[in-house]
Amino acid sequence: MVGYSLALGFPLGVSGGILEGLQRFYLMNWTNIVGTLARAVLIIYVLRHGLGLLSVALITVTLPLITAAVRAMIAQRLLTIPYGWKYVDRGSLRQVANYGSVTFMIIVAARMRFKSDAVIIGSFLSAAAITHFSIGARLVDYAGEVVSSLAQIFTPMSSHFHATGDFKQLRRIFITGNRACALVMFPMTVALIIMGKSVIEAWMGARYVITSYPVLLILLIPSTIYQAQSTSNRMLFGMSLHKALAYVALMEGVSNVALSIFLVRPLGIVGDAIGTAIPLACTALFFLPRHMCRQLGISIREFVYECYFYPAVLTAPMIAVLILMQHRFYAHRYPQLVLNLAAGIAAYGVGVGWYVLTRESFGIQLKDRFSRFVSGQVGPAEQ
């Protein structure tokens, strides 16, 4: 089943790229939402009726293919693309091959970065240790996946403006996009740092906290720095300037494996986490911001201030609220965990609302429209 899924997934995946290139993100989102909900409902149905893991696997493999097929039909309707060997252009094929080979290098490097840990830990420690490592690492992955999904839209946008030579818009995407990524990533980081022990206890049990929480902290900080620059990453793909990123990512992946092997014996799973964190931090701190700022003609100081000053400041109320809630009502189970997180999110939401309405142009315009609407309603009533 997995083999058939891979074989069909490659050609069907082109349709998703077409929709992204056309900037029809709402179609991508709706197909994702419907496909995910359908998969969840079917899996629950199968498990409740005792149909076995094979049925679950069939649903898990089939639903993404159906979603991709629906996207292919939508893309065909939008573009009415003709098919045939006479439409194959060698120059375009060469361009796609060059772009794809560099992208493949980055994919391989990403697998070395995040997927090699289980092999190393299983080889040098034990299979049981993989579970303790994976709990902390998976929480970091969940947070990063949210931001990565958000940043997907910047690839076709940056490709469009780079093709037209509009560097002013590219700089605007660079600043506002990374700021948006930080506004999403920073509160998740704060929540995991302060409430990570409670999350692990409620999710997996108290016995995993002492081993998994240090892994979470070690991986979370460099991952936050990297994910807060997700727009930079996607823009490099959009502008087809990701070759340097590919070489750096490969060096990072090799360094990750080497350091993890070197440190896993004396330090255990913490050593493996350190071996992953150090190369990732170097990429996020020393390569990615400098490379992007050089490409777009922006100073590092301007980049850091414009993208990260307000997102960092706005987390202060959330930090205070979460620390207070954890001190007064420490969360051991999901209900209290949700309550504490809701209080922290509410505090952060107030700050973000203030920022949007006073600092962002569309928020200021929205506030002005609302003020005019209210004054227009009050005026006639008073008359």
Positions of predicted regions on the chain:
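Interfacial segments at transmembrane-helix termini and the short loops linking adjacent helices
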Residues: 1-2, 192-223, 296, 330-331
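Membrane-interface junctions at transmembrane-helix termini in multi-pass inner-membrane proteins
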Residues: 4-32, 51-54, 75, 220-251, ...
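Alpha-helical transmembrane segments of polytopic membrane transporters and translocases
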Residues: 4-5, 65-66, 102, 117-119, ...
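Helix-loop junctions and terminal segments of transmembrane helices
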Residues: 20-21, 79-80, 136, 140-178, ...
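Hydrophobic alpha-helical transmembrane segments
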Residues: 29-78, 99, 250-258, 269-291, ...
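Helix-terminus/linker motif at the lipid-water interface of multi-pass membrane proteins
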Residues: 45-50, 104, 111-142, 160-161, ...
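Interhelical loop/hinge segments that connect adjacent transmembrane helices in multipass membrane
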Residues: 53-57, 71-114, 153, 157, ...
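Membrane-proximal transmembrane or re-entrant/amphipathic helices at the cytosolic face
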Residues: 298-300, 322-383
